[in-house]
Amino acid sequence: MKIINIGVLAHVDAGKTTLTESLLYNSGAITELGSVDKGTTRTDNTLLERQRGITIQTGITSFQWENTKVNIIDTPGHMDFLAEVYRSLSVLDGAILLISAKDFVQAQTRILFHALRKMGIPTIFFINKIDQNGIDLSTVYQDIKEKLSAEIVIKQKVELYPNMCVTNFTESEQWDTVIEGNDDLLEKYMSGKSLEALELEQEESIRFQNCSLFPLYHGSAKSNIGIDNLIEVITNKFYSSTHRGPSELCGNVFKIEYTKKRQRLAYIRLYSGVLHLRDSVRVSEKEKIKVTEMYTSINGELCKIDRAYSGEIVILQNEFLKLNSVLGDTKLLPQRKKIENPHPLLQTTVEPSKPEQREMLLDALLEISDSDPLLRYYVDSTTHEIILSFLGKVQMEVISALLQEKYHVEIELKEPTVIYMERPLKNAEYTIHIEVPPNPFWASIGLSVSPLPLGSGMQYESSVSLGYLNQSFQNAVMEGIRYGCEQGLYGWNVTDCKICFKYGLYYSPVSTPADFRMLTPIVLEQAFRKAGTELLEPYLSFKVYAPQEYLSRAYNDAPKYCANIVNTQLKNNEVIIIGEIPARCIQDYRNDLTFFTNGLSVCLAELKGYQVTTGEPVCQTRRLNSRIDKVRYMFNKIT
């Protein structure tokens, strides 16, 4: 049986969950349509998703049509959940990008389409909600051509009378775009030679698989218009990116989920081989796991199975598998272009409304961060506060609601702040000698620090030979440096810095690696104090798409938000403004753009890197370490 995995992607409220229900219903996988409004859909399966009417976590279901099994990945539609989208993209054989006939191309549609093209995933456009009043499809087509791609092939026409339906175009009506994109076919056509349908179909298929051509279909998921035709298209146009024939096992973990009973489930896409119940499987070329329970989606329901074949999505109950773990032969994993996950830029302090629920909160955050690596947390050793870092405010609102719904923990959040970093201002060295007060450790250490260009990251080298200071002591120094770089003079992580271990001395047999591990961060801090540090803040590169008449306002307002305009372009009826902006200002700039363009602007942004801050220095409370802080205090007093 052929197995294909497709993604359903769209902006918020474009109807992707409703479309999934219609595909299941029309294929016979379910006997009754679920409703987003009533909270009875198969993929939006949490109360939070049903209440908000949006998809938050990747949902998986399936149907079978003739000799093809289709696994449907119903992905989130809000930019704060892009990490969930990106993880699911890597397992897809193709995608359906929904566009609401009422709302046209939205900001999120552009982001998702950019990701699909970058990863090389064949994509079909599906214009949904064509049965709503006042729909002008020609305007929708033009919007798609201007904002997504002009290389679309409109495969159907919409019949309004006697009943609304969609019918396939004849061959002559749909081949213009295919011919225009191939010089040989165009020359043949212009010379009056006849073109065979087979060669046109082959050209369309090649360009579709190469993501340079996008077939376009219509329908209404809610009214069940065009769904049968879409099922035929899905099963015939998409190909499975799996290894055929006998081969070693290869699979990739793309989702971690916890059940209500706290069972930990790992979702795996198989790319080759066969996975059997009770198999012992090597994970990421390291340890082995034993398959004790295995599930897959069959006609919209999770069912236990005893074997799974290449192309399938399986679910294992396992405590050790992590996101992106590879089962079996890592060499068989398809090499797809990667998209950088959004980087957490905000952090806040969270505490339970009821102090007695603190342990419950920490246990819940451990599970949530295991499923979503973009949510990170730690407990401040000084204040004992729980610090969360995350992507956006909507993500934080959802996590707050999730904690209340699933874990029964209400929380209170402080106003979020941007996550900063630090860099040394100049070269500096510092040495602390053994048996010289106030050094209580049986170790001598000398370190130098040097600033590096922005974006260089951390570099480390040792000029102390292993013959003079053995590996265990040197490893302890590196561990101490990693710890010391977690807090610069302002309390933020240090980056763009070269650290050199220049001098070390030990006394045998009393010196231990722990002496070097404890002394290193103290030496490093003193070196930073001599060098001084500057505060770095995250900068975003952005693109603003807006109607041409708003160019002057958008351009002139940029300096108010510390934005630097790099370039402006005119395309069709839009102006494109390209620039850089501090992360702390992006939300205010977006809100301003939305206000004065009456919601007609789109602002796309991604992390560019860290630059020297233009705002006031922001300090973060240092985390305490009872074993070294007294010594730190003594050295700070004498320097």
From Swiss-Prot:
Function summary: Abolishes the inhibitory effect of tetracyclin on protein synthesis by a non-covalent modification of the ribosomes.
* Entry's transmembrane regions: none
Q: Which gene encodes it?
A: tetM
Taxonomic source organism: Staphylococcus aureus
Q: Sorted alphabetically, which SMART domains does this protein's record hold?
A: EFG_IV
For this chain, one GO molecular function annotation is: GTPase activity
> Which parts form a coiled-coil structure per UniProt?
none
Q: Which SUPFAM superfamilies match?
A: EF-G C-terminal domain-like, P-loop containing nucleoside triphosphate hydrolases, Ribosomal protein S5 domain 2-like, Translation proteins
Question: What are the entry keywords?
Answer: Antibiotic resistance, GTP-binding, Nucleotide-binding, Protein biosynthesis
Domain tr-type G positions = 1-242
Q: Name one GO biological process term.
A: ribosome disassembly
| PANTHER family (UniProt xref) | RIBOSOME-RELEASING FACTOR 2, MITOCHONDRIAL, TRANSLATION ELONGATION FACTOR G-RELATED
Q: Report the protein name in the record.
A: Tetracycline resistance protein TetM
The family database entries (Gene3D superfamilies) matched by this protein are listed as: 3.30.230.10, 3.30.70.240, Elongation Factor G (Translational Gtpase), domain 3, P-loop containing nucleotide triphosphate hydrolases, Translation factors
Return the Pfam families for the record.
Answer: EF-G_D2 (PF22042), EFG_C (PF00679), EFG_III (PF14492), EFG_IV (PF03764), GTP_EFTU (PF00009)
Q: Could you say which residues bind GTP here?
A: 10-17, 74-78, 128-131
Q: Which family does it belong to?
A: Belongs to the TRAFAC class translation factor GTPase superfamily. Classic translation factor GTPase family. TetM/TetO subfamily.
